[in-house]
Each structure stands twice: as structure tokens, then as C-alpha cells.
Amino acid sequence: MTKLKDQTRAILLATLMVTSVFAGAIAFTGSAAAERGNLDADSESFNKTIQSGDRVFLGEEISTDAGLGASNPLLTGTAGNSEGVSLDLSSPIPQTTENQPLGTYDVDGSGSATTPNVTLLAPRITDSEILTSSGGDVTGSAISSSDAGNLYVNADYNYESAEKVEVTVEDPSGTDITNEVLSGTDTFVDDGSIGSTSSTGGGVGIDMSDQDAGEYTIILEGAEDLDFGDATETMTLTISSQDEIGIELDSESVTQGTDVQYTVTNGIDGNEHVVAMDLSDLQNDATTEQAKEVFRNIGDTSEVGIANSSATNTSGSSTGPTVETADIAYAVVEIDGASAVGGIETQYLDDSEVDLEVYDAGVSATAAVGQDATNDITLTIEEGGTTLSSPTGQYVVGSEVDINGTATSSDSVAIYVRDDGDWQLLEIGGDNEISVDSDDTFEEEDIALSGLSGDGSSILSLTGTYRIGVIDASDADVGGDGSVDDSLTTSEFTSGVSSSNSIRVTDQALTGQFTTINGQVAPVETGTVDINGTASGANSVLVIFVDERGNVNYQEVSVDSDGTYDEDDITVGLTQGRVTAHILSVGRDSAIGDGSLPSGPSNGATLNDLTGYLDTLDQNNNNGEQINELIASETVDETASDDLIVTETFRLAESSTSIDSIYPDAAEAAGINPVATGETMVIAGSTNLKPDDNTISIEVTNEDGTSVALEDTDEWNNDGQWMVEIDTTDFETGTFTVEADDGDNTDTVNVEVVSEREDTTTSSDNATDTTTTTDGPTETTTTAEPTETTEEPTEETTTSSNTPGFGIAVALVALVGAALLALRREN
């Protein structure tokens, strides 16, 4: 019986095993039949049932009714950012990698190839387009309604295994018109359809020929879940009511010399069109090469040149008609999508209205001569202008300035100056012209207008009010020899492209000052001074020092372009005592004095020549006063001299530093004053040393010679007054020594630190306090009255706090108690 039961159990177990294997096979077969990604075969727009090895995407909602989503809805990441992270297929997959890392997920996180797994990817559309039946890409372009009857919307994307991309078309108001414009019934785009121009290429066909003019929106997105982020794409298509080829300008009115962009519109992708203008619109003196450059070879331009009815002369060619025998200047542009872009160089065009014409596809440049254009537009060319921004206003003889301005129609300009007669050329540069940059500006820097060659510069070397102007260099070549003329009449100047301003020429000016400390420079051997000032019109100034013994020292200092100069640490290098200091600048004539010096030269003497004369003076036996007179006689006091000079005096002295006063910060006072413990001690003094370059150290020592404080300063004004502050909180009372040390000199004083500083200032509020510290007020009645008032509370306080025992009341109670006790005992 037992054996029979065992056999029965074995049979049942075998049956269960066979049944489970068979059921698994059936389940596998069923899943294979619904293989994810076979959307084309199943005519499905999406499939959310997945199996091991499938790809899933961010944002998807996976089916948990069958497949891996039913058997293993919770997976674990195996590597990278996803390692150890759970992927729950029972809920929609998050849309971002921040919430769900990309990577491989399997049922146990092992990463084994035999373990059921999926790969999580980010859905994206990688490319999209709208094509015409001829293959022209019109995405984002404008086409005529007649050309919009057979269009294809295509895309490449990575999530076709999950769902198709669906096409939605919206009109300018945002209304969905997809069903109205579909060429078929399918709104779903197959992956890999890019470039397709047929109904079998996987794209979606649309017919926009019956739609009104306006901008239409074509939206691509997943058919089910994938309608966000990179899984979507939006394109535009503009339908034009104009059926023929058109032409537009980015600006219909420009200044001569300004580049203009034109756009051929409503074209068919790949078609070529001729754009042309009549050569009579060019300037009379335009050359053949310039005529060939009117149309720029940019953008969608494939050819430029000039033509007559029988031949063309293209850019780079040396054969064909010339500007005298050609009829048109032209460009050939190729339509890209629905439009083509080109450009025009207007500097060779006359200032007039120019008709720009476009021809149908297939019309050549030679055929365009004498043939009516399909469309045209008028470009207005206005005469160019020039402006001179600098120099204007005031000009100082000898100074350097920048010459700059604008010229909208010129390759180069020339600068002229006028007094009362003709305009005279300013000879700037080798060819007397200034080139105009591509942004229509011109500039020459650091030009000394009064120091150039020619009559124009001579005018500006004398004070007065004149006119300075700029003119197109081609208009300044009245003689026609290829170079600007030396002079122009007023009529010649104003008839050209020109403008002018007033300019006032003034003499040079000199200011300057020497920086000393309290009128001194120290020490004698190494003392230096700083100088600064203005010397308009000068390139440099000469600084001269003369001491009382007649010794001379000097240094040349350059002047900046703004007319200022600034030089630090000029060594005086003379003997102790009074020093006379000069700052000298040559005047408008650029010569020292009358141009001659005793040591040479006989004319045209410069600052450099003057230094040789100063060396001679330094070797003779004249005293300082005589040397100063000799310098003046050869410079500013010389006949007809226009030199300029600034003179100051100071003392060259040995360095010195002293302590002048010590006081508490709350009570400023002259001299050495006591300071109470806890107050801030202010130590003030004077020096003749330069700040920053020197430091004054202050050390405070007690009666034992121990240093208790050390401070320093390198900041003081030109009056030489310095100050430091020291906290005395940790000081004991007594006499302290304060020493100031500048590195070469010291000064020492003693100061008292007291427990309480005496205050001699009294008021009605502190009269009582004052009487306790002085002899006089102690005998007054005022002192006695408060004393009596104080005694009364003192007696009360004494009674309550100093009575021995328990007090009188307690003693009486004790006596009564003792009596009663004695009476009780007696009874």
C-alpha cells in the first residue's frame, strides 16, 4: 500500500513538471508573437509589452499584464550610474535621468548575460525635415501654395520599438488641421525616413496647397507616452499667397557704400535664378572689374559678372564684354529650400534708384538682357557722407591728437585746413590719405598737427580760429592724377563728399608743482622729490635744481599724450641748504630761447642742447643766484622766447624726526601731558622724510626698561605731521619713556601714566566730587550739608546691622518667660 502511494506521488510530480514546462513554452511562444518593436508588421502605433533584452525608454508606462513586466516588474541596475538602483515597471518610468539613471537593469542586479534584463534609454528625435517631391528641404521656409501640394514629413528617432512618431499639423491660429491636410490616412512616421520623397518611404505625406497664407506648425512626438523633451520636434512651414518667384531686400534705402542683402523667395529647392541690374545704375567712372563686383559672391550665389545678349564676363575671367559693351550686372543664385540669399556692393552704384530684377528658373544671364523680369524691387542709393569727430574745438600747438571720424562711401579720406583762402592739405602718412575701415570709420593716432610738412600744418602752428575738414579722397583728386591735391578751392571741397568743423589753435601752457615735506627734502645725500603738472603741446619738460653754491642737477621728464606729466623720486643730488627748482618747457617754436645757446647750437636749440649748457654752468664758479639768472636769460627771458617755466624753492636738509606732544585722546593738548591708565595715548610729532618710503617706529618702555608697546607709521601728509595711538589698558602707573625712531634719528621723552587723570573742569553737577579732591571746597557749607545727610542713614544702618544678641524685644520676651518658669516651679 505504501509503495503504491509513493508511485502515485511520483506520477503526479512528473505530471506537474511536464505541465509547467509545456506552459512555459506556450508563454514564450505567445511573447514571441508579440515581439516588441514589430510595429510595422502589427500595424500598431505603440507596444508596451516587453521581454528580456528589450529597450525601454524614460517616460514609458510598461504593460504589467504580460511579458517581463508581468513576471518581474522590479529590476535592479547592474553598472554605472544605475548600479543598485531599482527600476519599477509597475509604475510609469520617470522622464529624467536624475530620477531614473540610464543603463542595464535585470531581475537580480547581477549583470549576468543569462539573467532577464532590459536597457533603459532616453527617447529622442535625431533628425526631422519637410521635403518637396523633388527632394527640396523647405523646413522653416516659405513656399507658394502651388508648390505645397506634395510634401513629406520625415524623421529619424530611436524609440520606434516602443512607439511611432505621430505628426500633428496646426494652422496659424493653433487649430489641429492634420486630418484635412493628410495625403493618406497614416499620421505615423517610420524611423529612418529622412530623405524620403514617396508614399512608401516611411514619411507622412501632407498637401498644403489649399491652405491660406501664413505660418503652419508641424509637431512630431511619440504616439503614446513619449511626448516630451528631445522625444518631440516642432517645425514650421510658411505658405505664401504669391505663386511666382519674388525678391526682397533687407533694406530698401541705404547710404552709398553700404552692403545690402537680397533674398529670392518662393523658389523651388535646387532651381537657379538670375538677379540683375542695368549697368547705367553704376557710377560713370566705374571700371569693368568694379562692375563685376557689384553683386557679391556670398550666400547662395554661384556666379557673378556682367553680360550682354551674347556673352558674359564673370568674376575672375579676363574675357567677355567690358563695362562699355555690357548691358547688365548679374548674379546667379541657387534656391535652398524655398529661398536664396545674395548681396550687393553699393559703393560703385550712383546715388539714385536702382531696379533689382529676378528671372524665372532656366533664364540665363544673356537671355535676361532684353527680357521682362518675373519680379523686381527698387533699391534707393543715397549719397554717402563724412564726419570728422576729432580734432575739433581747441588744439594746443605742438600737441598730439587722434584724427578720426566716419565715411560711409569712401575707401579713403584726406584732411584739409582752411584759414581765409583755399583749403590746404594736411600731409598725413606717405600718400596723404587715411584708409576707411569696413565699419566706415577711419583713424590716425598721435598726430602733431602743427609739426607736419606742408601749408596745412603751417596754418595750425599759429594761434587763431580755422576750419578743419575731411573729404572723400577720390573727390580731392581734382587733377585726376591718382593722388589728392595739395589745395582745393572752397567750391571743389564742398562739391565733394566732405564736412568740416571749427578748430581754435592756442599756445602751449605749463603748470607744475614739487612735492616736499614741510618745505624740505631729506636726507641731503639721497633726498628725492615728486613732481606733477601739465605741459600741453610738449613732449617733455626739463626739471632743473640749483643750490646756493651754484651746483646744478637736472632730469628730463616725458609728457603723456593727454598733456600731463608725473614723475616720482627725482634725486636732488646737491648740497645742504636752499635749492631753487625749475620745470622748463619749450614753446610753440620748439626751440630754447631764441634758438641759440652759448655752448651751441646757433639756432634750433632743444632741451637736449640746454642740458649741455647746464653742464657748463655746473663747472663754473657762479653762485646759485647767478646760475638762475643765466638760465632765465637763455630761456624765458631771451628775446622772442616763448619758453615756459615754473619755479619753486625748498630746503635740502638732513633728516629729522621729533616727538612734539603726548596727550590722552579724550583731551587733546600741546606738549607732554599725563595719561590715565586705560586711556588711549596719542603721540604726535613732525618729520621731513617722505611718507611710504620711510617708517617712524614708536616704542614705549617702563621704568625697568621693558618695552610695553611698539607702533609704527608710514603715513603722513606733506606738512610732515605724524601721529600714532597706543592703548594703555595694561600699563601700570609710573614714568614711561617714549622713543621715536626713523632709522637714522631718534627722539625720546618721558610721560607719566597715572591712575586717575586730574580734571580741572568743574560744573554744578560734580561740585561734590571736586571738593573731595581739592582743599578749598572742603571747608565750604556745601560739603557739610551732604555730610550730615549721610550720617542719619548711617546710624540707622548701624543699628540694624551691628546690635549684638537678639535685640531688646527678644530680651524682654526672654525675661517674661524666665519669670513664668520660676513661678511654675515654685508652685
Curated annotation (Swiss-Prot):
- Which Pfam families does the record match to this protein? PGF-CTERM
Q: Where is the composition biased (Polar residues)?
A: 73-102
Question: What are the glycosylated positions?
Answer: N47, N117, N308, N313, N532, N766
- Mind telling me which InterPro entries this protein's record contains? Csg_halobact, PGF_CTERM, Surf_glycop_sig_pep
Q: What is its main location?
A: secreted
Q: Where is this region: Disordered?
A: 73-111, 755-804
Q: Any one cellular component term from GO for this entry?
A: plasma membrane
In what ranges is there compositional bias, type Low complexity? Answer: 761-787
Q: Where is this motif: PGF sorting signal?
A: 804-806
One of the GO BP terms on file:
cell wall organization
Q: What is known of its domains?
A: The glycoprotein is arranged on a p6 lattice with a lattice constant of 16.8 nm. It forms 4.5 nm high, dome-shaped, morphological complexes with a narrow pore at the apex opening into a 'funnel' towards the cell membrane.
**What name goes with this protein?**
Cell surface glycoprotein
Q: What is the lineage of its organism?
A: Archaea, Methanobacteriati, Methanobacteriota, Stenosarchaea group, Halobacteria
